[in-house]
Amino acid sequence: MEVFGDLDKVDDAECVEVDPTRRYIRYNEVLGRGAMKTVYKAFDEVEGIEVAWSQVEIDEVMQSPDNLERLYSEVHLLKSLKHENVMKFYNYWVDDQKKTINVITELFTSGSLRQYRQKHPRVDLKAIKNWARQVLRGLDYLHTHQPPIIHRDLKCDNIFVNGNHGEVKIGDLGLATVMLTPRAKSVIGTPEFMAPELYDENYDELVDIYSFGMCMLEMFTLEYPYSECTNAAQIFKKVSKGVKPAALAKITNIQAKQFIDKCLVPASERLSAKELLQDPFLCSDNSSVLVGTKFPSSLPKSVDVSLEALHMDVDTNESMCTSTCKRNDLGGPHRSVLEFTRTNKNTELKLTGEKLDDNSVSLVLRIADLCGHARNIHFLFYLDSDTAMSVAAEMVEQLELADCDVTFIADFIDLLIVNLVPGQQLMNDAVMSTSSESKMGESEHVITSQQHPSELTHDYVLVEGMMHSKEANASPSDYIDSLLNATNLGGPNSSEGSDISVQLDGSSKSLSEYGVDEYRTLECGAYKGTDKLGCRHPLSNGSSNFAIFQMDQASHHSELVIGASVSITENRDVLNGELGLIEAQYEQWFRELTRMREEALEGARKKWLPDK
């Protein structure tokens, strides 16, 4: 390759990196940041065009097999796809020295369609029809590919624009999947754009048509779908009941509204991309109606979506479990992810937590029965203000669960939070208002034993919402064994409890696999005995309340009691002391887990990046 000019004369502040072939020059200008990658502006010296240079830290990707799978899936798909309405792929390579994975794609001068639409709030109906046709052509290409490809996260954030000639292309295929079977199984996407059948874990490429309809709604109204909802649980409730977004009522053009409705009908009635391209609404361009003139040009704070929009990704038992527990003790940008699973003869609950920043955790709860029916709900947990009980109560209300499930779900959330965020002080709804209640002389419900708090002499840790003693010199395996013994409320004969498994560094292990000689089922919080569990209604019946777990009202335990009434004014110091002990013991446990994690990471690096 013959290049004219001197690279040394390029401003160092602008040119920061050159690819191994010296064809692409990366500038320091950041175009965007995603969940895994940073996108920079770059220049192709051969073609003389500007391109997009996506860069991912290998260490960050290697901590999560899920992230690695997504990255290589996107690269593989982009390499094989060639269509005028699908993002172009140019090249990719791994930089062993800088430990980065680099991908070169085409550059879109106007950013995403959402950004473009926000920048230009007044557009003619003809323009929206033009965008819609291009997106449908891209979807038709993906869906008729052999095998078919489902995007699964189609939204205006993932549709890109070259505004100088109105070109629109589908991009961000990191969550796309190849349809090797007639029906897909995993739940993944952005809640506001997810079709109802996605939550049921049984869907095909028509889920992209539903998402396309939501994209059309955003193009017309400049609003995110379901912006009237404050959380994902409310969105799930409306979607599962077939309630359309409130923004749909703001569309005054009857033909446009009818066209969007065709995309949002049940999957059995939904048209394909090819069929929608033949719709009379798109076949006619003789309209000069301006749209978007009376709608807000910014998204509500509660549903503001950045390039790092959350993705729901919960796989069924039929697929490989890819969630991991990864931690960044150096305070870097890596996200921590942890997953717990509780199973029973009737029900399986899977709670996945991802630490987004210092103050928020993204949680995904999956509730499934033996028949394969499942419900999935995604919600945010704010560490400085939310409590497990308040979030659980909201989930129970939105999902129409039984009231007795609030405590169980709250215990489940507390268990995950205290493991995901070392040192996090668990907030209690009652403790948050101690000052006002102490003045009134009211008592608080705290977790303790029948023994008086002042007589507690052992170290204690919080597991499943209960305090358990731990010998100071116990090893991690002894510690876990003591937890298993302590939480086996029903004794050796209680086989129908709740078991718990932890995903660590890509390998699914139960607690028994970490050095415990004898594994016993973990009971669920205060629930005890073989009669405590029972699914009263099938999960597929979304209109009626159902109980995840039933509490055995007659069951008691001689050592552990939930809800013992203790005065805050008398025992606040004791409570604070116990919380300090909890934090100290979990720190010790996490140090051991960190060591295990580092060993696993090193093994992964040696596997994927062998020394040359």
From Swiss-Prot:
Keyword Kinase listed: yes
Matches recorded under InterPro entries: Kinase-like_dom_sf (IPR011009), Kinase_OSR1/WNK_CCT (IPR024678), Prot_kinase_dom (IPR000719), Ser/Thr_kinase_AS (IPR008271), WNK_Ser-Thr_kinase (IPR050588)
Annotated active site: 172 (proton acceptor)
Gene3D superfamilies: Phosphatidylinositol 3-kinase Catalytic Subunit, Chain A, domain 1, Phosphorylase Kinase, domain 1, Transferase(Phosphotransferase) domain 1
Keyword Cytoplasm: no
EC number: 2.7.11.1
GO molecular function: ATP binding; protein serine kinase activity; protein serine/threonine kinase activity
UniProt keywords, alphabetically: ATP-binding, Kinase, Nucleotide-binding, Serine/threonine-protein kinase, Transferase
Binding site for ATP: 105-108, 155
SUPFAM superfamilies: Protein kinase-like (PK-like) (SSF56112)
One annotated GO biological process: intracellular signal transduction
Catalysed reactions listed for this entry: L-seryl-[protein] + ATP = O-phospho-L-seryl-[protein] + ADP + H(+); L-threonyl-[protein] + ATP = O-phospho-L-threonyl-[protein] + ADP + H(+)
Domain Protein kinase: from-to ranges: 25-282
PROSITE patterns: PROTEIN_KINASE_DOM, PROTEIN_KINASE_ST
One GO CC term, this protein: cytoplasm
PANTHER family cross-referenced by the UniProt entry: SERINE/THREONINE-PROTEIN KINASE WNK WITH NO LYSINE -RELATED
Family listed: Belongs to the protein kinase superfamily. Ser/Thr protein kinase family. WNK subfamily.
Protein name per UniProt: Probable serine/threonine-protein kinase WNK4
Organism of origin: Oryza sativa subsp. japonica
Gene: WNK4
